Amino acid sequence: MSEGVRIGSLVHTDHRADVLRMLEEGLAQGGTVVTGGAAVEGDGAFMQPTVVTDVAASNLLFQEELFGPVLAVTKFTEEAEALALANDTPFGLLNGVWTNDLSRAHRFARDLQSGMVSINEYPITFPQTAFTGWKQSGIGIEQSQDALRFYTRVKNVNVKL
């Protein structure tokens, strides 16, 4: 990594073990580790940032939420193919779109089947914005006024005075 880049620990050594196990299972289905792929010795539950290329859309690394520093790279040729690949998963927490064409990015973000989309940046959440997933990535909404609505039931009561 470049000087000054910092990456935090995973939440627990058991979680790191789960991520490493899923990485191993995914690699058995195909793919090439370009960098990383191992635990970092010492305090905490650190893991090397890992990039795996040539990952098929059916691969566990493509289909599951690992919640670890693993990037599975899949090639595509057309925008429609990229959208179909992104939506062909049972999960829909977050998608990232990287492009210089913001009109294209917004069109793509509209059609992605996920609760959150980050364009040209690492995902950032604010208390005023909803944190939500689609499909099997969760039920409900956290943060924002939308979250408050999730826990309320509206009732209209009329009284003649």
Model-derived features: where do they sit?
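Short secondary-structure junctions
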Residues: 30-37
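Short secondary-structure junctions and interdomain/linker hinges
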Residues: 29-30, 158
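Short beta-strand to alpha-helix junction loop
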Residues: 10-20
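Conserved C-terminal structural/oligomerization subdomain of aldehyde/semialdehyde dehydrogenase
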Residues: 7, 39, 46-161
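Amidase signature
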Residues: 22-23, 42
